[in-house]
């Protein structure tokens, strides 16, 4: 987790005792603003949120003991005011050994389930009976790179959008048990694999693959992404004065925010270019 708080401007905090001192200070100075929620098992959970710039902050969380002692369990970064990424079906589960919640999003645009760290767990605890209407996705990156865009004509862009929409519809039909849809998807995948195998012999992979969203490593909420840069904001951590970039990325037709320390991004980010990096994926749920 220490690798990812550098993405919000804490790159000098590399040792556990340094991070502990930072968390102690934030908890001590902001204890009056602590939010407390009670779970259905009568467990009292708390969190303290410290805004560090216009868009990012650090959340410290834990549980209350019987005598009112605040026991800290962990911390995570967050991004505020991100846009809706998906309105697909989403489920939330609590981890067995701590008060961390994860979400699973079934979005057919990706053709797989996305697992993310829930960024607003107390909202969920206070409103468990309310339906989840949408999810705002955002991630944190400690090492990113800017890629040039793939040159496309307007016809190619429209054709790509249509193929993506058709594939989404086929996946929806396949989930309902449509045999024709399953056969079509299988044939398309085989054809795509054959085409890529031929092209990869003479072309760079990032000149073939426009955007990418796939699991990375052993953690289930870490993803490797390649996406188009739609917007860029530069901000400053008020505690460390480190520069932070907040990128709005479109990846496989899904929009999400990505925070990265400015010095950790190789290349000059501009709208229209692409971003490549491994992100720790978080999500804020919106409820009806």
Regions found by a protein language model. Give the residues of each.
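N-terminal alpha-helical "arm" segments
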Residues: 1-43
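Long, hydrophobic alpha/beta structural blocks
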Residues: 40-217
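Short, Lys/Arg- and Gly-enriched loop/turn segments at beta-strand edges
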Residues: 280-288
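Short amphipathic beta-strand/extended segments with alternating polar/hydrophobic composition
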Residues: 113-117, 256-262
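Short coil-to-beta-strand transition motifs
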Residues: 216-228, 273
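Short nucleic-acid-contacting surface segments enriched for D/E, G, S/T with interspersed K/R
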Residues: 262-277
């Amino acid at each position: 987790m220490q690798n990812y708080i550098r993405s919000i401007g804490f790159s000098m905090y590399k040792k556990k005792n340094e991070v502990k001192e930072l968390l102690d200070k934030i908890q001590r100075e902001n204890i009056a603003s602590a939010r407390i929620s009670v779970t259905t098992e009568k467990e009292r959970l708390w969190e303290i949120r410290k805004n560090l710039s216009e868009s990012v902050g650090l959340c410290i969380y834990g549980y209350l003991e019987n005598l009112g002692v605040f026991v800290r369990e962990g911390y995570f970064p967050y991004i505020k005011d991100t846009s809706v990424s998906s309105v697909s079906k989403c489920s939330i589960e609590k981890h067995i050994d701590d008060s961390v919640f994860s979400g699973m999003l079934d979005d057919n645009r990706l053709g797989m389930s996305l697992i993310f760290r829930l960024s607003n767990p107390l909202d969920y605890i206070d409103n468990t009976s309310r339906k989840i209407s949408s999810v705002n996705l955002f991630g944190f990156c400690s090492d990113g790179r800017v890629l040039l865009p793939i040159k496309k004509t307007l016809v190619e862009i429209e054709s790509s959008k249509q193929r993506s929409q058709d594939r989404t519809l086929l996946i929806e039909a396949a989930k309902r048990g449509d045999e024709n849809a399953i056969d079509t998807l299988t044939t398309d995948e085989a054809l795509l694999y054959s085409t890529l195998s031929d092209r990869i012999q003479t072309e760079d992979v990032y000149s073939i693959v426009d955007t990418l969203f796939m699991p990375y490593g052993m953690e289930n909420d870490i993803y490797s992404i390649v996406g188009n840069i739609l917007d860029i904001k530069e901000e400053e951590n008020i505690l460390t004065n480190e520069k932070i970039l907040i990128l709005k990325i479109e990846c496989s037709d899904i929009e999400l925010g990505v925070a990265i320390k400015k010095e950790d991004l190789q290349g000059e980010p501009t709208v229209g270019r692409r971003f490549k990096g491994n992100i720790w994926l978080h999500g804020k749920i919106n409820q009806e």
